[in-house]
Amino acid sequence: MDAESLLLALELASGSGQGLSPDRRASLLTSLMLVKRDYRFDRVLFWGRILGLVADYYIAQGVSEDQLAPRKTLYSLNCMEWSLLPPATKEMETQTSVVKGRFMGDPSHEYEHTELQKVNEGEKVFEEEVVVQIKEETRLVSVIDQIDKAVAVIPRGALFKTPFGPINVNRTFEGLSLSEAKKLSSYFHFREPVELKNKTLLEKAELDPSLDFMDSLEHDIPKGSWSVQMERGNALVVLRSLLWPGLTFYHAPRTKNYGYIYVGTGEKNLDLPFML
Amino acid sequence: MGDPPPDPEPPSQPTSSSRNSQVSERRRSRERTRPLVPEELQQIPLDPQRNLRGWPQRASLTPNENLVFQAEDPYVNPGFSAEVQPQAYLSEGRLQASHNASLMLPQLQQGEGNLFQQLESAYQGPPADLPGQFTMYQREDLPFSQGTQHGPYMRDDPTLQFSPSELGFMSFNMELPEPEPRELAVQNAKAYLLQTSVNSDLSLYEHLANMLTKILNQRPEDPLFLLESLNRTTQWEWFHPKLDTLRDDPEMQPTYEMAERQKALFGRSGSGEGEQEMEEETAETAVPNIMEKAFYFEQAGVGLSSDESFRVFMALKQLVEQQPIHTCRFWGKILGLSRSYLVAEVEFREGEEEAEEEEVEEMTEGGEGMEAHGEEEGDEDEDKATDVIPKPTWKPPPVIPKEDSRTGTNRYLYFVCNEPGRPWMRLPHVTPIQIVQARKIRKFFTGYLDAPVISYPPFPGNEANYLRAQIARISAATHISPLGFYQFGEEEGDEEEEGGAGRDSYEENPDFEGIPVLELVDSMANWVHHTQHILPQGRCTWVNPLQKTEEEEELGEEEEKADEGVEEVEQEVGPPLLTPLSEDAEIMHMAPWTARLSCTLSPQYSVAVVRSNLWPGAYAYASGKKFENIYIGWGHKYSPENFNPSLPAPIQHEYPSGPDTIEMSDPTVEEEQALKAAQEQALAAAEEEEEDEEEDEDEDQDD
């Protein structure tokens, strides 16, 4: 959610039950302003909160002019001092995929994972148990990246693409209509498109190239991994991800308010197929 | 647009020409029909300034003025013949455009039909007819009373001599002059702009014209800045004409309905008794102070927003008015796929709920009785059949009776509603088997209470039962209070009761002084569970399933045989009531509870917040003498390992093969024939014997 409309956004996203306490809200309002100035971001988004056992991580993301460029992620433990996280890489993802369980809340905490590695000693090949240390910070980076790639949502029409390249915020976006808001096809993944090229020519013919340049949520696997609900007496549409429980996207139809926030434990719901 | 820049002309001219073009058709028709026009037209060039002043009026598009303005343009300057032609083509474009077509159609019909046919044909074949157009528009400069024109034909009209234009030479020149390349370019550009887009009937030309009209109508401060948004709005308005004020917007209908319903929440029941009502209401009510609790939870960063909490409060108030409720509490919110549930935990006043319970029980018992009868009849029929079907030796496991109301898991009644304003629905009591099965499955709630729960092992009930079972589990696991808030009643001195079940009731401690917040956060021993733990059996108090109640003894005579195979069942014991949290089992080396101060910056005013790691979404706060629990979440337990569904039951044994159960195979044709042959032989042999015997007898007789 945009840091500029933080209060309203928190109010609208509160249907999922988790929000921020007043002191955190106040600190965020000030500190995000400073972050925007220091890092020269075009927009700062408050991404959410990952609940740890000892402490929680508050995550913010900074967006540059091109909205789809990789965003810089910052974390903080007290909503005041922010530290930049390194960008996520493939190795990080494979490394952290073995770590399970909750986040501790201490960025320097190290998870120990024993692996069997083949070690060549001269002519002998034997397996040795190697204890690999994985830092929680790496895990944090990787989880945030996965969540962004999987379930960050933006409504159709909020961004538009110019033929010259950069993706811009659409200042004339007036919100989706009520009938559109209930359909999953009106929402896109807020990331580089992956499946767009797989569409048939017939489907592509109906797309508007300036607006439909991202993957829509319609074809997410497993089907039904999004819960679409109307709240506040039909005045707010809320999408909740079932794959990463804790991600809430809200949008007030016919207005410009939209945003998403993740408040959760940072664990993927791998039992989803059983639960639907 | 490719118009040649008109220099001495005021800058509004190009736009004005475009405006003109829109109704040029109309005007031209009027030109045809009004011979008076030429004189007016003649006068206009005397006052080119009028063009500017007349602009706002022009926008209103009254026919007369338009006519005047349009007609004036060709006369502004003879040197602007080039200007004239674009207008001509614009007007052709108008023919194509559906927008004005409807407006112009009657005029077209009134006007000289021939002219427009000619125009159309001219447009369709611009290159061929360019010269024709050229000449026609040259002629347009002339005031003419009679309409019919056919392109490059000469017109034999004495009035043609009037015009100061250079048409003079055209009148005598039958050759078709080459159009200048510039004009050609202009015409091409215009034709391109008039293309209608694929998705709609709107062409860029029309759109630009609309937008410029709008800008000129409204005269905003900084039109360049607003250009983009105006662009979008104009386009949008084209396709979404404003609906009647008499008709409601169909899309917003459900929203308005919901708003009406919520409005009803805010209305006070009973009208205008004024002070009396106020006094009644300020007395003790069963409705808890939701707003206060919401405030504390907000400090912890949990809970619904404040206006939503207020709506919940009003909804609870409505519930209290509708049902005979003794105490009431907002239990929490369970999220579902299509809708969510708001759950209220209530206790009825003494004796009130028995009536409903009995009705429900009678219905179920009646149903069971009928089923039993049906089965018995079926059995009898089968018995009468020739084959005796072996009776199965499998017996269903004994049904563990559910707990009584107000005890154990059924201590409280739960009402749910989807949104404040919707009616509250009561959830049925939970049975032990439902809890046991609920532990084995993991399903999302859809939001509809009568939805079936499709799972393996099959859940005995629908979503209402599953919801109730989860609520029971969550309550038992996560309802905590500060140590000392509740204490055991002094009347129960004995710890040993039936089967060592322990105490199951508690009362508030009037001497509770509150524990300092820091201590609450530091040690989990300062919190206790105040709901009973649910045993693996599914109940809070253990019941030996093999003990027969009186009903069972009446019905099940056959079941006595099963006593022989009885196994000893161990009594299940769970932690007693008011156990501190420090005794809770760890989840994979992880503490089951996390305690924090709500605000580290101001510890003196914070509340202690405890969060459950076992049931994510369960929170409790305590501050001074107040505490509260809430659950907002999906309704599932946290498990570090992945969910493993139960395996299906092993394949049942088949009956051992024996002569009773094996089907006889039919004899094949060969066998039958062989049998037949053997039978015939035997018969033949028998006949021979008989014959022999007869012969013997005969012989005997003969003798």
Swiss-Prot record, chain A:
Membrane-traversing stretches: none
Subcellular location(s) of the protein: Cytoplasm, Cytoskeleton, Cilium axoneme; Cytoplasm, Cytoskeleton, Flagellum axoneme; Cell projection, Kinocilium
Entry-linked InterPro entries: RSP9 (IPR055316)
Cellular component terms (Gene Ontology): 9+2 motile cilium; axoneme; kinocilium; radial spoke head; sperm flagellum
Keywords: Cell projection, Cilium, Cilium biogenesis/degradation, Cytoplasm, Cytoskeleton, Flagellum
GO BP field: axoneme assembly; cilium movement involved in cell motility; motile cilium assembly
Function: Functions as part of axonemal radial spoke complexes that play an important part in the motility of sperm and cilia. Essential for both the radial spoke head assembly and the central pair microtubule stability in ependymal motile cilia. Required for motility of olfactory and neural cilia and for the structural integrity of ciliary axonemes in both 9+0 and 9+2 motile cilia.
Quaternary state and interactors: Component of the axonemal radial spoke 1 (RS1) and 2 (RS2) complexes, at least composed of spoke head proteins RSPH1, RSPH3, RSPH9 and the cilia-specific component RSPH4A or sperm-specific component RSPH6A, spoke stalk proteins RSPH14, DNAJB13, DYDC1, ROPN1L and NME5, and the RS1 complex-specific anchor protein IQUB. Interacts with IQUB. Interacts with RSPH3B. Interacts with RSPH4A. Interacts with RSPH6A. Interacts with CFAP61. Interacts with LRRC23.
Family recorded in the similarity comment: Belongs to the flagellar radial spoke RSP9 family.
Protein's name in the database: Radial spoke head protein 9 homolog
Organism: Bos taurus
